C-alpha cells in the first residue's frame, strides 16, 4: 500500500469506502505502526466483523483495543481488552490484554472526591491478574497501580470522616473514623484520625443530653488512652490531655451528683 495513499485525506476516504478487506487491513496496520490511532481504529472497527474466522482477526482485535487506549478512551479500551482475553485466552497477546484492561481501569479511576466504583473494579481486576499471572513481567507495574488506588481510597475514607467532623456530625464522624482505623491500620493519616475521633467523641459527649453524657465521656476517655498508647509523641498530645481532663472532671462530677442523690 503506497505511502502517498496513506498520507492523503482522499486516500483515507477511499479506504473507508473500499470493500477490499485485505487492503483495509494492511492500511490499518500501517496507520497503527505510524501512530495514527484514530484512523487505524476506525478501519479496524469496520474490519473486525469481516475478519471473523481469519488469522488476522486476533491481531485486529488487540490492536483495536489499543487504539482506544492510545486515544485515552479508557472505558472502551478496558471493555475491548477484556473482550479480547476472554475470546483469545491462549493468545500470545492474552496476558498483555489482561494487563492493559487493568491499566485502562487504573487510568479511568476518578479523583478521590468522586464515586470510586471504577477504582474498586480496577483493584479487583488487578488482583485477578496477579492471581492468574504471578510471575508476569508486568507484576511490578501492576502492584504499583494497586498501591496508588488503595491510597486514593484511603484518602477518600479519611476526608469523608473529616467532613463529618467539620460539619459537626460527631456521631457519624466517630463511626467513620473507627471504620477508617479498621480499614487502614497503617495509614499515614492514622495519628490525625485517632485525634479527631477523640475530639469528635468529646464534643459529642459535651453536646449530649444529660442522661447520655457519662457514657459518652467515658468513651472519650477510652479513645484518649488508645491515642496516647499509639502516639505518645504526638504534637496534639496537649490538646488530647485537655479533653481527657475535662472528660474526667465531668464524669467525676456526675458520679458525685449521683451518689448525693442516692
Task: State where each predicted segment sits.
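Acidic, polar-rich low-complexity tracts and alpha-helical solenoid repeat scaffolds
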Residues: 5-262
Amino acid at each position: 500500500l503506497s505511502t502517498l495513499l496513506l498520507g492523503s485525506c482522499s486516500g483515507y476516504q477511499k479506504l473507508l469506502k473500499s470493500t477490499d478487506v485485505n487492503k483495509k487491513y494492511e492500511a490499518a496496520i500501517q496507520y497503527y505502526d505510524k501512530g495514527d490511532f484514530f484512523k487505524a481504529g476506525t478501519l479496524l472497527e469496520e474490519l473486525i466483523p469481516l475478519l471473523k474466522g481469519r488469522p488476522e482477526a486476533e491481531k485486529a482485535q488487540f490492536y483495536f483495543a489499543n487504539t482506544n487506549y492510545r486515544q485515552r478512551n479508557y472505558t472502551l479500551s478496558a471493555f475491548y481488552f477484556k473482550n479480547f482475553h476472554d475470546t483469545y485466552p491462549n493468545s500470545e497477546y492474552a496476558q498483555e490484554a489482561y494487563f492493559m484492561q487493568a491499566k485502562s481501569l487504573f487510568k479511568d479511576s476518578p479523583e478521590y472526591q468522586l464515586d470510586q466504583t471504577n477504582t474498586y473494579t480496577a483493584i479487583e481486576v488487578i488482583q485477578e491478574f496477579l492471581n492468574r499471572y504471578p510471575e508476569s513481567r508486568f507484576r511490578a507495574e501492576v502492584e504499583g497501580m494497586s498501591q496508588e488506588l488503595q491510597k486514593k481510597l484511603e484518602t477518600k475514607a479519611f476526608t469523608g470522616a473529616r467532613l463529618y467532623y467539620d460539619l459537626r456530625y460527631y456521631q457519624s464522624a466517630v463511626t467513620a473514623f473507627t471504620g477508617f482505623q479498621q480499614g487502614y491500620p497503617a495509614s499515614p493519616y492514622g495519628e490525625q484520625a485517632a485525634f479527631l475521633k477523640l475530639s469528635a467523641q468529646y464534643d459529642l459527649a459535651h453536646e449530649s443530653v444529660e442522661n447520655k453524657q457519662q457514657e459518652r465521656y467515658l468513651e472519650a476517655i477510652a479513645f484518649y488512652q488508645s491515642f496516647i498508647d499509639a502516639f505518645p509523641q504526638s504534637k496534639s498530645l496537649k490538646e488530647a490531655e485537655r479533653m481527657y481532663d475535662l472528660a474526667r472532671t465531668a464524669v467525676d462530677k456526675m458520679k458525685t451528683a449521683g451518689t448525693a442523690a442516692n
